[in-house]
Regions:
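Predominantly soluble domains enriched in secretory-pathway, periplasmic, or organellar proteins
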Residues: 1-189
Length: 189
C-alpha cells in the first residue's frame, strides 16, 4: 500500500493498493508524473501520480529470488537503479518498459543514490561494510570504500561533490548498540 498524503495539512489524499508485498523503495519522477515502487515480490511498480492508479507491476527477474529494497532514478535517461538484499547485484532498469538494461555485480545492497553531477551511482553494502562507486555509463565499479560496521543511508551535497554515508553500529536483539551511529563524509573530487 502507498498512502498519498497532503504535504501542507498531512491529510490522507488517496490510498494506492496492489503494490505488492512490502513496498520498500520509492522514487518520484515529478516531471513524468510517475512514482516507482520496489517490493519483496521482486517487482517494479509504476504509479501515475495524477490518478494515483497502478500503471504496471513487472516482475524484473523470474530466475532468482529477489527482495528489492531501494531505488534511485536517472530521469534524464529513464533509468532506475535498484538494490537487492537477496542477490549480489544492482539492477539497472528502463523505467519506460521495465526491461533490465544491466546487472551490476556487487555485494547484496541496501541504499542506492544516482549522482547526475558526476554520472555515478553509490550503493551501500551493509553486511560487507562497503560502499560501491559505480560509473553510470559503463556500469563498472570505479571504487570500493571500506566503512566501519554497517553503511546504511546516502545523501549528496547540493553540488554533487560530497557523499554522506550514515553508518549503523553493530546491534542485535541480544546486544544493543552502545555507541551512537556515525556519518562519513566522502570527498568525490
Amino acid at each position: 500500500v502507498v498512502w498519498v498524503v497532503d504535504g501542507k495539512d498531512l491529510t490522507l489524499r488517496a490510498t494506492v493498493t496492489d503494490t505488492g508485498k512490502y513496498g520498500t523503495g520509492l522514487a518520484l519522477d515529478a516531471a513524468a508524473k510517475r512514482l516507482y515502487v520496489t517490493n519483496a515480490d521482486g517487482e517494479l511498480v509504476t504509479i501515475d501520480t495524477q490518478s494515483n492508479k497502478v500503471l504496471s507491476r513487472k516482475k524484473l527477474d523470474e530466475s532468482k529470488e529477489h527482495f528489492f529494497l531501494n531505488i534511485s532514478l536517472d530521469t534524464a535517461t529513464h533509468r532506475a537503479f535498484i538494490t537487492d538484499s537477496k542477490q549480489p547485484q544492482v539492477l539497472v532498469v528502463d523505467t519506460r518498459n521495465g526491461n533490465i538494461l544491466s546487472k551490476i555485480d556487487v555485494p547484496e545492497s541496501l541504499a542506492v543514490l544516482f549522482n547526475p553531477a558526476r554520472n555515478e551511482v553509490y550503493v551501500t553494502h551493509r553486511q560487507a561494510g562497503e560502499v560501491s562507486v559505480i560509473d553510470a555509463k559503463s556500469y563498472k565499479v570505479l571504487n570500493t570504500i571500506k566503512t566501519p560496521t554497517h553503511p546504511n543511508s546516502l545523501a549528496l551535497s547540493p553540488d554533487g561533490q560530497t557523499l554522506y554515508v550514515s553508518v549503523k553500529q553493530a546491534s542485535s536483539r541480544e546486544k544493543e548498540a552502545t555507541a551512537p551511529d556515525d556519518v562519513i563524509r566522502v570527498a568525490l573530487k
